[in-house]
Amino acid sequence: MQAFSGKPKLEVRVPHSRGLTLTDENKFGEEAESKQWIGVDLDGTLAQADPWQGFEHIGKPVPNMMKRVKIWIELGYRVKILTARAQDPDLAIPPIREWLSKHGLPDLEITNAKDMDMIELWDDRCVQVVPNTGNPVGPNPEPYRR
């Protein structure tokens, strides 16, 4: 067993879908890669989930997720903030843009919709299922919901 000193290393997964035909238009190669994106939820994933205090309040950054997003951007991945807040874009988007800028992230796209170009979603509420089965990929998520 190896002893660890200092902070534990951050695991950053690189999406595996580069070049696959996952776009709405079934594009291949670089054209497909330019459309593909990683979705990152805001509250509870990129920012700490605080009790609702209105659109202007966004929790403190979650350090590990901030690092992941910055690495993905450096590697050339397209990252979007996928948040339910964006259902009211006039109220939601300006404070999110300000929060991103304040915490060193670029002007990312902000949406509340996913499409076939999304290759991954990072969210505190997701349960991944085996396609066409309804069965969870990993262990039963219920213990984590309590």
Name these PLM-found stretches.
Residues 2-146:
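Catalytic phosphate/metal-binding cores of nucleic-acid and nucleotide-processing enzymes, i.e., regions
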